[in-house]
Design a protein with these regions (language model features):
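A conserved mid-protein helix/loop that constitutes part of the nucleotide-sugar donor-binding site
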Residues: 15-23, 187-202, 215-218
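Conserved acidic donor-binding segment of nucleotide-sugar-dependent glycosyltransferases
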Residues: 290-291, 295-302, 309-316
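Active-site donor-binding acidic/aromatic loop of nucleotide-activated sugar
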Residues: 216-219, 230-240, 245, 295-296
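Aromatic "clamp/platform" in nucleotide-sugar-dependent glycosyltransferases that forms part
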Residues: 258
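Short hydrophobic beta-strand element within catalytic cores of glycosyltransferases
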Residues: 275-278
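Short His-centered aromatic/hydrophobic patch
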Residues: 85-93, 112
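Conserved donor-binding/catalytic core segment of Leloir-type glycosyltransferases
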Residues: 5-7, 172-190, 197-200
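N-terminal strand-loop element at the rim of the active site
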Residues: 6-66, 216
Length: 348
């Protein structure tokens, strides 16, 4: 049985990447000997309990950077008959350099879950071309890899998996526009909640449920107070099982992000027949189909945002059409693409 080691860094335990990892590892463990390597101890560890017990979890628990480097070096130097799927650019670079220097035979495949250009975490140009192959989770990332002059045959577009769910029942007799946001609470930066709060200020009959927390929670709450929208918002805090909390169909998910990789909460929402209001970050249209499963607006354009919110209220999108709009992400199609892509890279 072939061995695969999934290399991850800086996982919090609360994000969409962890959700995808659970599904992918639990699928692949039936075909490969799987190890999950974490270069940090996640803040939240409940997600690890959802991983198949046949998956070996290898976690760095030290604190010094030198110890961490040695921990990672040992993987590439001493593991036998193992290929690597890396969610970490630094580990792609390190593994590829060791492979070349010591003439190792393993494959290093990148699998990144965020936009490659809208970030300052690593130098894409001097990192990504070293990988033997790339699993792209969105058309935007696929295009970014091509722009780095990576050969087309080294890139496979696989998207991300999402379960197929029943459509949630409609909220009874509500004339209110019920919006929700789920994710890290950030006033500015990636999640850009400032814009969301500005948007709901302009509409009277709206209520926003915010599921999540973060270092900027207090700043967001203070800004909501300053904008006079505090009474329109319920702050739920960190919610480990979002869909046990949301039992009836809200009007829409709202996202005002500056950038995303492929938003899992967006997919989870659409899969339940709930439309999406979103900023036009790169790759948003991998999921959102205008007037079919949601509405979009240009970042910074609050007038467009309020119009998108009003469209949700005035145009009753068919929840079955919403759900069916992302059929390519459902397990049967997704795992077919994943399996064939891995076979292509690992057998080459």
């Amino acid at each position: 049985m072939k061995k695969l080691n999934f290399l991850c860094s800086e996982l919090s335990g609360t994000g969409g990447t962890e959700t995808v990892l659970i599904k992918v590892l639990n699928h692949l463990v039936n075909k490969y000997e799987i190890t999950l390597t974490l270069s940090n101890v996640p803040e939240e560890k409940e997600w690890l309990d959802k991983i198949d017990t046949r998956v070996k979890i290898n976690m760095f628990k030290g604190k010094s950077n030198i110890s961490k480097l040695l921990f990672i070096l040992k993987l590439f130097l001493f593991e036998k008959n193992t290929d690597y799927i890396s969610l970490s650019p630094k580990m792609v670079l390190l593994g590829s350099k060791i492979k070349k220097f010591l003439n190792k035979k393993y494959q290093v495949i990148s699998w990144f879950h965020y936009s490659l250009t809208d970030q300052d975490m690593f130098d894409t140009e001097h990192t990504l071309p070293y990988a033997d192959g790339h699993l792209a989770i969105s058309r935007t990332i696929e295009k970014q890899l091509e722009d780095l002059k990576i050969p087309r045959e080294k890139i496979k577009l696989i998207f991300n998996p999402i379960e197929e769910y029943d459509v949630l029942p409609e909220t009874n007799n509500s004339k209110e526009i019920n919006l929700f946001y789920a994710g890290r609470v950030m006033l500015d930066g990636q999640k850009n909640l400032r814009e969301m709060l500005m948007g709901i200020k302009e509409i009277d009959n709206v209520h926003l449920d915010i599921y999540g927390t973060g270092e900027e929670l207090e700043s967001c709450q203070n800004y909501a107070g300053k904008m006079g929208v505090s009474k329109k918002i319920t702050w739920h805090g960190w919610t480990p099982d979002l869909w046990n909390k949301i039992k009836e169909r809200p009007s829409a998910l709202i996202m005002t992000s500056k950038y995303e990789g492929l938003s899992m909460v967006m997919l989870e929402t659409v899969a339940r027949g709930i439309p999406v209001i979103t900023s036009k970050f790169k790759s948003y249209d991998d999921i959102v189909k205008e007037n079919i499963n949601g509405y979009s607006y240009s970042l910074g354009n609050i007038k467009e945002l309020t119009k998108a919110i009003e469209k949700v209220a005035n145009n009753a999108l068919n929840p079955i059409d919403v759900k069916n709009s992302i059929s390519e992400y459902y397990p049967k199609e997704y795992f077919k693409r994943l399996d064939s892509s891995l076979e292509y890279f690992l057998d080459s």
